[in-house]
Amino acid sequence: METRGAVQTRRLIAAGVIGNVLEWYDFAIYGYFAAQIGRQFFPHADPVAQLLSAFGVFALGYLVRPVGGALIGHIGDRWGRRAALTFSVAAMAISTFLIGLLPGYATAGLAAPVALTLLRMVQGLSVGGEYTSSMVFLVEHAPPGRRGLMGALAHCGTSFGILLGSAVGAGFAAVMPAAALDAWGWRIPFLLGLLLGIAGYFLRRNVLETAPAVERRRAPIVETLHDHWRIVLGLAGLAVFYAVNFYVSFIYLVSWLQTADGISPAHALEINSLSMALLLPVGIAVGLLTDRFGRKPFLLLATLAGFVCAVPLFWVLHHSALLLAQLGQLGFVLIVGIYGSVQPAIMVEAAPPQVRCTAVALGFNICLGVIGGLTPLAAAWLVARTGDEIVPAFLIMGAAAVSFVAILSFRETYRAPFSGAGAGAAAART
């Protein structure tokens, strides 16, 4: 018979993971339908210019992530994790639904891309606090010796949400004529996001608040920037490799496979979906292993693999054969899966409990907003400028070098004392 503590822990996991799934489904589908959105909202004759414009709006959504991280991190440290998570999923659901209703440039003129940009900024504000708040939420409530696994579940929730978006995109691309998909079919996944958001909102709205028993700060962002800025910079450096590698591998490559290799949209999305599915077992396995062998060895291994393998993997990807394209992306998946699954636990463990949401959100989102959000745009621009389809690999190599140095500055935390909420520990003791 399950104990009351075990049931509560399971509900906490569901709230953290499932809400994250819903949030990242909403945010990911924009990247997957970037080509269609570019044609609807930007009146350029050149398809490359349309794609650059669509990814430019994508980047703006990311550039506001630090602001969203500061806002939602403040809510999490001041009023509790539940309030932060509920706010983020509600904002995402509403903005996603409205994107699905927006008229295109042919109907609304300049107002169409302006409105799209504003809604993407709302999404960026929401995502700025969502992932990091769920990381904190899950790791704080981990049973003893399971913080790595619980942090990996946060990453798995993200992966499953993006997988869901990719699968939905692949399904519509497979069954709809290209003209219908361009005209209106791309809107359906955005409209469906409202239903997913409502489910996530009520799931989080009803979960028990079990924040750590520490003094709530009135201005956590001020304390974070004044007293813990070194930690924020370290967390940002840690996130560089994840930001660049993830968004090259799973956002930019969907369009790259179509433009560089001539692979159809349906096949490009199928490749992405199959690759994303592998992240789930990899994440769980790596999370368990880091609780036994530590965080840093896996992080260092992933950055070294990214530096050495980026160019060869892009060379493999740059073939029209579907099997080779799939194998190339699977290589990136293994690297991202290892790194992304370890990252949540070490970030949360490194941050002081009284400003944990704010510190993790700022460190992670400064990097994801400035670097990750610009990565698809930078990759597309470099390819257009140089004519070299392999050049995005050098972005991954540079990011790997930066994060390798940042990792060395962190102490090993998997056996260090940790101030969490105690829900997971309580479940283990009951």
Task: Enumerate the language-model features and the residues they cover.
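Helix-to-loop junctions at the C-terminal end of transmembrane segments
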Residues: 69-80, 283-295
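Extracytoplasmic gate region of multi-pass secondary transporters
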Residues: 31, 229-279, 372-376
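C-terminal transmembrane helical hairpin of 12-TM major facilitator-type secondary transporters
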Residues: 297-342
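C-terminal ends and interior cores of transmembrane alpha-helices
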Residues: 90-109, 304-319
